[in-house]
A protein has these predicted regions:
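N-terminal secretory signal peptides and thylakoid transit peptides that target proteins
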Residues: 1-16
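C-terminal segment of N-terminal export signals and the immediately downstream linker at the start
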Residues: 20-37
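N-terminal accessory beta-strand-rich subdomains and adjacent acidic, glycine-rich linkers
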Residues: 33-293
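Solvent-exposed beta-strand/loop surfaces of large extracellular or lumenal domains
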Residues: 105-107, 169-176, 595-616
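An acidic-aromatic substrate-binding cleft motif
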Residues: 267-280, 287-330, 340
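Aromatic- and carboxylate-enriched substrate-binding clefts and catalytic-loop regions
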Residues: 350-500
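Carbohydrate-binding surface patches
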Residues: 551-589, 629-630
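C-terminal beta-strand-rich structural cap/linker in extracellular carbohydrate-active enzymes
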Residues: 612-634
Length: 634
């Protein structure tokens, strides 16, 4: 629904009285708005004769984004000035109502929004496209341009309501940081936030998160605090150099990538996304990132995410829990993967010491156990079309089905372009990918279904990680909002720190990753008392429900369905607790249940219970500090 001030009162008269949120809104002078299909979310564009264009976002008549700057400057030089004025007019209102197959949180995605274009004039001239969804808003800048190299510079800011609480980490570890929780008044000028930035809105209004989607032919974004409740969108060349990038590539390469990238032809920025929900369930289930990302190319993916050669699955991995870096060692891992019913074995870089005959020997051996093989590769070795073609042709020759590409660690346009080239070239050879040392996801897995997952998270590889329980119960409501993450969950040794075995098993069912790589040695999984339940945890889900008892940094409780089977998975934070959980999500009928509980006397043990349950059952669950619970209902 698109409204101007002149038509607003006329529109109100036609509204049913059962939607009071709509009736309370009054637009300021010289304002245009785009309203979500259900009327609860409004994007307002405010402009005056001699003032810059600003926007604001409201949810149920309460502010989510306070009046904030926006704008796109395009220059042939890299030091643009602020525009003196903008004047806006609205064009082309439209509505979208569609569904599409997806994977991860759910099997069906929905794109329902109202949209409009706004022509912006003044010192800069461009189009602003806005879409309002029932779970947030998205906007982007469009500039037709010509073949002259031009450098884009954005004025976009996100000013949050006072009394908001935010969760974010900086760029020191690129996207492998630990989230801080701060009142917005405590965030200082110059602090950096790596998206997504999660927000708890004041007065129990709900939650929001800020990130981007459909990132291509453009630099990735970060957020820089202004010390006044605002965050300024900052492009990749201006972001601080991360420790991983400096370690792997050096400061001279970082300096080179700090030069703003010029774009030839039309400029289409990524969508700037504000996810909005009344609770954590609504926030986690927000579908905007996928909805605004381009659909997959039917040339490569005739059935989209269901294309035959693109197969999500679970994987064993020799890296964090013993094993041999040898051909025989990898044969053992593949055999054990088959015993677990897992689909893949991810082989680290030592495969490069083998001959092609040895590579094929492993692949053929693994195939005998219905286990596919993935190879690791350094991204610096795949910078040219020739190098990519050589590698993917090797994968085809020896039968490798997927590649784990590592060490990107930068949001510069050059690196974003590399992701796109890798995904396209891999698709041409029908090779699946996952990225490590990577940037946040931004909808790439919708456009390129051969991207199964990416790291961009502080996961089990972080051997010095402390306070893992608090970290793990924060991640589902922060990093995972942007998309799947390869945390490499479930370790039964010292890396689990203060978390229990039950917590570790539950993490595999909560941390979404269509390529679900397990940290534990497969023998240790087979020897665990919970192995029969672990074997049944899928890597993709048909439905995800975040339960009301969830609280960021304290408790993550998910009910998830695959087919007719439900899982209840809970990770507890630092404080021991006892909670009661109703099983109304099960629907009618009795179900056989397997419950894995904390052993309250020993964190490195579990208690297994076999019982029956139905939708009227209420489970009483006691968890230790860093504890957990997981139940399977067949």
């Amino acid at each position: 629904m698109i409204q101007s001030r002149r038509s607003f009162l006329k529109g109100v008269l036609a509204l049913p009285l059962v939607v009071p949120d709509r009736l309370a809104w009054a637009l300021p002078t010289n304002a245009e708005s785009v309203v979500s299909p259900n009327g609860t979310i409004r994007f307002e564009l405010v402009h005056g004769k001699n003032s810059p264009v600003k926007y604001q976002v409201k949810f149920r008549n309460r502010p989510v984004i306070e009046p904030s700057d926006l704008g796109l400057l395009v220059r042939t030089q890299d030091a643009p000035d602020k525009p003196s004025q903008h004047v806006a007019r609205r064009t082309g209102p439209y509505a979208m109502r569609e569904s599409f197959p997806t994977r991860g949180l759910r099997s069906i995605g929905v794109n329902q929004c109202n949209g409009a274009y706004f022509e912006i004039e003044g010192d800069a001239k461009y189009r602003l496209e806005v879409r309002a969804f029932d779970d947030g808003i998205a906007f982007r800048y469009l500039d037709e341009g010509d073949d002259t190299p031009r450098v884009p510079y954005e004025l976009t800011t996100f000013v949050l309501p006072s009394e908001s609480v935010v969760w974010f980490h900086d760029f020191q570890g690129h996207y492998e940081g630990v989230h801080a929780r701060k009142n917005i008044s405590e965030v200082k000028d110059g602090e950096w936030a790596a998206p997504p930035l999660t927000v708890r809105l004041p007065a129990d209004v709900g939650y929001a998160a800020i990130t981007e989607a459909a990132l291509m032919n453009y630099a990735g974004m970060g957020l820089r605090a202004d010390g006044r409740s605002g965050f300024k969108l900052t492009l990749g060349d201006q972001l601080p150099v991360s420790y991983p990038f400096e370690l792997r590539y050096g400061l001279s390469e970082a300096k080179r990538l700090s030069q703003p990238a010029a774009i030839r032809g039309a400029i289409k920025t990524p969508w700037r996304v504000v996810m909005i929900g009344k609770d954590l369930n609504a926030l986690v289930n927000c579908q905007i990132i996928e909805a605004v990302s381009p659909a997959p190319d039917r040339k490569f993916f005739p059935l989209g995410v269901n294309t035959k050669w693109v197969k999500p699955g679970r994987a064993v991995w020799k890296y964090l829990d013993g094993g041999q870096n040898t051909l025989d060692g990898m044969k053992e891992f593949s055999r054990l993967a088959g015993e677990l019913g897992f689909e893949y074995n991810v082989v680290e870089g030592f495969w490069q010491r083998w001959s092609e005959a040895q590579m094929k020997e492993l692949v053929d051996y693994a195939n005998g156990y219905k286990v596919g093989t993935w190879f690791w590769k350094h991204s610096k070795e795949l910078r040219t079309p020739y190098a990519r073609r050589q590698f993917f042709e090797l994968c085809n020759r020896v039968g490798v089905v997927g590649a784990k590409i590592d060490f990107f660690d930068h949001e510069a346009k050059e690196i974003i372009d590399l992701y796109q080239s890798l995904l396209r070239d891999a698709a041409e050879h029908q090779v699946m990918l996952e990225f490590h040392g990577s940037n946040k996801p931004a909808g790439e897995n919708r456009t390129w279904p051969n991207e199964l997952s990416r790291e961009s998270i502080r996961g089990m590889e972080a051997s010095r990680m402390t306070e893992r329980a608090q970290h793990n119960t924060t991640l589902p409501f922060t990093r995972f909002l942007a998309g799947p993450a390869d945390y490499t969950p479930m370790h039964f040794g010292e890396r689990r720190r203060e978390t229990s075995w039950s917590h570790q098993v539950a993490s595999a069912a909560i941390f979404t990753s269509p390529l679900l790589i397990y940290a534990a040695h497969p023998r240790n999984i087979l020897d665990n008392p919970a192995v029969e339940l672990i074997k049944n945890i899928p890597s993709v889900w048909d439905e995800t429900v975040v339960l009301d008892s969830s609280e960021i940094g304290k408790l993550a409780a998910y009910a998830r369905r695959k087919g007719t089977k439900w899982f209840l998975a809970i990770m507890n934070g630092p404080s021991p607790r006892k909670i009661d959980i109703g099983l109304d999500f099960l629907g009618r009928g009795n179900r056989r249940a397997v419950l894995v509980r904390d052993d309250m006397s020993e964190p490195a043990a579990v208690k297994i219970e076999h019982t029956t349950a139905h939708d009227k059952t209420a489970l009483s669950i006691e968890m230790r500090s860093g504890g957990g619970f997981i139940g399977m209902f067949g």
